[in-house]
Amino acid sequence: MGMRMMFTMFLLVVLTTTVVSFNSDRESNHENRRTSNQITRGMWDECCDDPPCRQNNMEHCPAS
């Protein structure tokens, strides 16, 4: 009975780890998708050098 209980606990731990890992991976995929849709830092640097663009996007440009 001891071996059967240990095997059951092992399966429970493996299943729990797999489910948690799968859900975490799904969340990170959404974060990656959001990040890939955003403008890169280099593009914001170019925008911040242009006064009209800087005026329209002040939240992305540091104060000078």
Curated annotation (Swiss-Prot):
InterPro entries: Conotoxin_a-typ. Its main location: secreted. Expressed by the venom duct. Residues 49-51 are annotated as: Lacks the Ser-Xaa-Pro motif that is crucial for potent interaction with nAChR. Keywords: Acetylcholine receptor inhibiting toxin, Disulfide bond, Ion channel impairing toxin, Neurotoxin, Postsynaptic neurotoxin, Secreted, Signal, Toxin. Residues 1-21 form the signal peptide. The keyword Secreted applies. Residues 22-41 form a propeptide. It is found in: Secreted. The keyword Disulfide bond applies. It holds the Pfam family Toxin_8. GO terms for cellular component: extracellular region; host cell postsynaptic membrane. One of its GO terms (molecular function) is acetylcholine receptor inhibitor activity. Disulfide bonds join C47-C53, C48-C61. The cysteine framework is I (CC-C-C). Alpha4/7 pattern. Alpha-conotoxins act on postsynaptic membranes, they bind to the nicotinic acetylcholine receptors (nAChR) and thus inhibit them. Has possibly a distinct nAChR binding mode from other alpha-conotoxins, due to a different three residue motif (lacks the Ser-Xaa-Pro motif). Belongs to the conotoxin A superfamily. This is Alpha-conotoxin-like Lp1.7. It comes from Conus leopardus.
